[in-house]
């Protein structure tokens, strides 16, 4: 598949850690020949238990080959409703077009029904759901339909398959992405732009504690969590011409995850 995205321009959001899903996606799209704008918002990771990448943003970009003719970077907080349009505009200003949007960013939140606050509900909704729609809106407004390969790839986390009662703000906002996918796919189908969502299942990006890591691994037939590379391969295919007949789908790439045995 080397070179199958030659001439295409991609935006990948949520590229903030070298062990993260966004990093693996950006690396694979670059390897396939695309020019890529990566987005990050390091303050979010810094306030989470797993922390920001110790190498910082510069280290993440260096690991992708460094800023140059095929790689650019933008930092933005998607809690700001104007940020999605600015990020898309930056991609077009930098590379002259935008063909592939990968909305991989997320705000994580651990709050159950007794703990949940209006502020956290609003913030997760703004980042996870609203920003995904506004990114798609800005993407569609600038897209040149004469260019091949119009792709929007969103991310959910299996909320349509099982409850996540300990993570209500996250689960509710990410669960909405499945309906966003269906509706945007219909809205953009006549323009030749496909819209799909990826549910990557449990992926080891360093966030889980040892007990959860062991418990989830027992529920996966391979005996291991998914890896960022597993997700990146799927996204690379969805970004390619080979996926042109697929739209409006939420693809569950979970390695046969048996939730019921946990």
Predicted features and spans:
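Conserved NAD(P)H cofactor-binding loop of Rossmann-fold oxidoreductase domains
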Residues: 104-109, 256
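Short, small/polar-rich loop/turn modules that mediate ligand/substrate recognition or access, typified
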Residues: 189, 194, 246-248
